Design a protein with these regions (language model features):
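Polytopic transmembrane helical bundles with strong interfacial aromatic enrichment
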Residues: 1-525
Length: 525
C-alpha cells in the first residue's frame, strides 16, 4: 500500500467532510445575528422565533464542525510530518492567531449566547452572538491565509532549504489569500441563504398542505392558524415567509459576489498557476476559446487526444486577461516550461522514498480539474437561478402547493454545498504534483516549493494510514448520522421544537416576551 496515496485520500475525505460544516457555520451565523439584531431593535416576536429556530440549527452545525475540525490539526503531524517541518515556521503565526484569538472568541462568546437568554441584557446578549460570529469569520481568514501561502508563497526567505518567515504582513495580505477569502465568504453566505430558503419553503408548503394557509381568487395568501398544533399561528407564517425571502434575496446577492470574486481569482490563477487553469479548461494548445464541453481521456497523459466539442471563441482569453484576443498558454506549452524550471525527475533524496528519481508528471488530473471547475460553476448557477425564481413565486405571500417544487427547493439546499466542495477539490487537486506551489511571478518568492511526494511522513506505513482512515471514517460516519438526525428532527419540529414555551404559554409569557428561565436549557445542548 502506497502511504502517499492513502494519506492523500484520508486528508481529502476528512477535509471535504469538515468543509461541509464550515460554510454553513459562517453563512448561517451571520444571518442569525442579523435576525437577533432585528428582534432587539423592533421587539417583534417574528424575529425572536427566527433567531431561536435558525440558531438551534446553527449550534448543531457549529458543534459538529468543531468535532470534525480537530482532526485536521493532528493529520499534519501523523501523516504529513515532512510537510509540517517545511511549512511550520510560516504556518505557526496564522494558525496560532486562529486558535488563540479567533476560536477563543467563537467558543467563549457562543457559550455566553447559549446560556445568556433572559440572564443577560438584550444588547449584551446580542453582542455575544456578534462576537462569536465575527470570531468565526476571522478564524476562516487565518485558515485561508495558511492555505493561500501554499498556493502562492510570500513573505519568506530560504534558509537551509526551508522557508523562514521574514514578513508576517506579507503573509497576511497575500493577494491570493485576500481574493480567496472574499470568494469563500461569499460562497458561505450563499450556503446559509439557500439553507433558509429550502427549509422555509418546506414549512410554508406544509401549511398549504394542512389547509392552514389558502389562496384566494386573486392568488393572494389567506393566512390561517391551527390551535391544535403548537406554533402554527399567523406569526408562524410570517417567520417562514420572511426567512424564505431573506434567503432568496441574500442568495442572489451572494452568488453575484461569488461570480465577481471568482472572476478576479481566476485571473490571478492564470498568472500564478497557469497549468492548473489550462487543465481546468482542457486547453492542450495555446488559444483564446473556452471549452464548454470536451471529450476524450482527460485523465490520460496524451493531451492531444482531448477533443473540444463546444467552444466559445475569445471567452478563455477574457477570463484570463480581460480581452478577447490574447492567447492563453495551453498544456503542451506549459509542461515543458515546468520541466525546464523544476526538473524532469524527482531528486534522488531519501525523503522521496521509493519515488526518488521518478519522472515528474506536472499535468494535474484533468478529469478532476475540468469537471470540478464546471460543477462548481454549474451548481452555483442552478442555485442562483432557483433563488431568483423563489423570489418571484413567493411575491404574493406563500409558495405553490406543489410537492415536486417543494422537494426541488429542499434538494436545492445541496447545490451551494456541491459548488463549495467542487471548488475546493479543484483548487487542491489542480496544484499537483506540488503541495507548496512555485509561482515567483508576479509577487511570489522564487525557489519556495515542495513536491507532494516529499510531504508524507516517512515513518508511517500504508497499513497504519489505512487503519487511521478506517477509524476516522467510522467516527465521521457516526457524526454524520448524529447531525442528520438532529437537523431533521428540529427542522420537522419547526419553531415549536426550538421554543417549547409556545406549547405552554401562561400569564408569565406574553406574546412578545422572550423565554423564561426554565426554558433556557431547552435551547442548549
Amino acid at each position: 500500500m502506497d502511504p502517499l496515496e492513502i494519506a492523500r485520500w484520508q486528508f481529502g475525505i476528512t477535509t471535504v467532510y469538515h468543509f461541509v460544516m464550515v460554510p454553513l457555520t459562517l453563512g448561517l451565523g451571520l444571518l442569525v445575528a442579523v435576525m437577533q439584531t432585528m428582534w432587539v431593535r423592533t421587539g417583534n416576536e417574528r424575529w425572536l422565533r427566527m433567531t431561536k429556530f435558525w440558531g438551534k440549527l446553527y449550534l448543531i452545525n457549529f458543534i459538529m464542525g468543531v468535532a470534525t475540525g480537530l482532526v485536521q490539526e493532528f493529520q499534519f503531524g501523523m501523516a504529513w510530518s515532512e510537510y509540517s517541518r517545511f511549512v511550520g515556521d510560516v504556518f505557526g503565526a496564522p494558525l496560532a492567531m486562529e486558535g488563540l484569538l479567533a476560536f477563543f472568541f467563537e467558543s467563549t462568546f457562543l457559550g455566553l449566547w447559549i446560556f445568556g437568554w433572559d440572564r443577560l441584557p438584550k444588547k449584551v446578549h446580542l453582542a455575544t452572538l456578534w462576537t462569536a460570529v465575527v470570531g468565526s469569520v476571522v478564524s476562516a481568514f487565518f485558515i485561508i491565509v495558511a492555505n493561500s501561502w501554499m498556493q502562492h508563497p510570500v513573505g519568506v526567505e530560504l534558509v537551509d532549504g526551508r522557508p523562514v518567515m521574514n514578513d508576517v504582513w506579507a503573509v497576511l495580505t497575500n493577494n491570493t489569500a485576500l481574493v480567496a477569502y472574499s470568494h469563500t465568504l461569499a460562497g458561505a453566505v450563499a450556503v446559509g441563504a439557500a439553507f433558509l430558503l429550502g427549509i422555509s419553503w418546506y414549512h410554508l408548503w406544509q401549511r398549504r398542505r394542512d389547509g392552514i394557509d389558502t389562496v384566494d381568487d386573486r392568488g393572494a395568501v389567506v393566512v390561517g392558524e391551527r390551535a391544535d398544533i403548537p406554533g402554527r399561528d399567523r406569526t408562524d407564517h410570517r417567520v417562514w415567509l420572511t426567512s424564505l425571502r431573506i434567503g432568496a434575496a441574500v442568495a442572489v446577492a451572494a452568488f453575484a459576489g461569488v461570480a465577481a470574486t471568482g472572476d478576479v481569482q481566476g485571473k490571478l490563477m492564470f498568472e500564478q498557476q497557469p497549468l492548473k487553469m489550462a487543465a481546468a479548461e482542457a486547453a492542450c494548445h495555446d488559444g483564446t476559446g473556452f471549452s464548454v464541453l470536451s471529450v476524450g481521456p482527460l485523465g490520460g497523459q496524451d493531451c492531444d487526444e482531448v477533443v473540444t466539442v463546444i467552444e466559445i471563441p475569445g471567452l478563455l482569453s477574457f477570463l484570463a486577461h480581460n480581452d478577447f484576443d490574447t492567447e492563453v498558454k495551453g498544456v503542451n506549452t506549459l509542461v515543458p516550461e515546468y520541466r525546464e524550471a523544476y526538473g524532469t525527475h524527482l531528486p534522488d533524496d531519501p525523503i522521496y522514498g521509493e519515488r526518488a528519481g521518478q519522472e515528474i508528471d506536472y499535468l494535474p488530473l484533468m478529469e478532476v480539474t475540468y469537471w470540478g471547475f464546471r460543477l462548481m460553476i454549474g451548481f452555483g448557477m442552478l442555485a442562483a437561478a432557483f433563488a431568483a425564481l423563489a423570489l418571484w413565486l413567493t411575491r404574493k405571500g406563500t409558495v405553490p402547493d406543489s410537492r415536486p417544487l417543494m422537494w426541488t427547493a429542499v434538494a436545492g439546499i445541496l447545490a451551494p454545498f456541491g459548488a463549495n466542495i467542487a471548488g475546493w477539490v479543484f483548487t487542491e487537486m489542480g496544484r499537483q504534483p506540488f503541495v507548496v506551489v512555485p509561482n515567483p511571478n508576479p509577487s511570489g518568492v522564487d525557489g519556495v516549493y515542495m513536491f507532494t511526494a516529499a510531504a508524507v511522513s516517512p515513518g508511517v506505513s500504508g497499513q497504519e494510514i489505512v487503519f487511521s482512515l478506517a477509524t476516522l471514517g467510522l467516527i465521521y460516519g457516526v457524526l454524520l448520522v448524529v447531525e442528520t438526525v438532529l437537523i431533521v428532527r428540529y427542522v420537522r419540529g419547526g419553531v415549536a421544537a426550538a421554543m417549547p414555551e409556545l406549547a405552554h404559554r401562561d400569564e408569565e409569557h406574553g406574546p412578545t416576551d422572550g423565554p423564561g428561565r426554565d426554558d433556557v436549557l431547552a435551547f442548549a445542548y
